[in-house]
């Protein structure tokens, strides 16, 4: 601590002469005494200057005891001193000053029971809207069912009137002071645990409210979309179909459904050699009993595989009634299983084609 003293001023402190702590020849600094006067106007307060050397233990203890008295008085009267030396305050004095600040700002917000401060602060619905459950609105006849804090329950139990509404900025400052006092370590022991739970309750309620809002979203649109999606699968698919038919039935269905593009599947025996034609085409003749069918295959994207005369082949394509030619898109030898199941496929295709032609004639 720096002292501003005159060089010619001589002071007597309890019969002891002032002892300079620094050598004035080497440094031009003001001397410090081991036991200074408290009422000296030249001594600056610790709140102004904080550059001070280590002090003797007996002097610091006397100064601290002298300062604890006005601090305790301010705690009892509810007033805060204007200038209190900060570096010499212990943890107990810091806790008492924080408690006095809280009592002064709250006014009638707390009561003392056996020297225990019980917090009665409740959330004001105008300033801090608590997150209420929407599902209980119908059960409570339109009344919001909000969770009651422990402070509010104690207030209702002891019959204490509700505290006045404070402005929002004062409440936020009060919350910050209480939160900082809780983090301070040893000063945390005197506070109630319920107040700590009340401090973190709004964030938890807000998360619960967001989760409930997501659950309460109406699902009418999603249900409609899923129902339409399922109906589309339940309906019969109108995709491209290959009609299994013999040569005679193929010519018949092509004649009665001229406006419709039909893709036929024919199983017949190769009855001629494969001859090349114009535009990379290959022509051959297929026979089914007494009926014959000239076929053509264009080698545009792939070549025609090797065909053996006298064997059953599977040909897929479109029948041109005017030219009496079957334009193949796929030709390959038929397997044994395909030959056995082909008659059943022909019967199913006949039923479908009769139904389709009847519907087309009615329209």
Curated annotation (Swiss-Prot):
GO biological process: gamete generation; homologous chromosome pairing at meiosis; meiotic DNA repair synthesis; regulation of meiotic cell cycle
Protein name from the UniProt record: Spermatogenesis-associated protein 22
Keyword annotations of the record: Chromosome, Meiosis
Region (Disordered): 1-51, 145-169
Coiled coil segments of this chain: none
Gene name of the encoded protein: SPATA22
UniProt xrefs under PANTHER family: SPERMATOGENESIS-ASSOCIATED PROTEIN 22
Main location as per UniProt: nucleus
GO cellular component, one term: chromosome
InterPro entries hit by this protein: Spata22
Bias-annotated ranges (Polar residues): 1-12, 145-157
Biological function: Meiosis-specific protein required for homologous recombination in meiosis I.
Tissues/organs with expression: Expressed in testis.
Subcellular location: Chromosome
Oligomeric form and interacting partners: Component of a multiprotein complex with MEIOB and RPA2. Interacts with MEIOB. Interacts with the complex BRME1:HSF2BP:BRCA2.
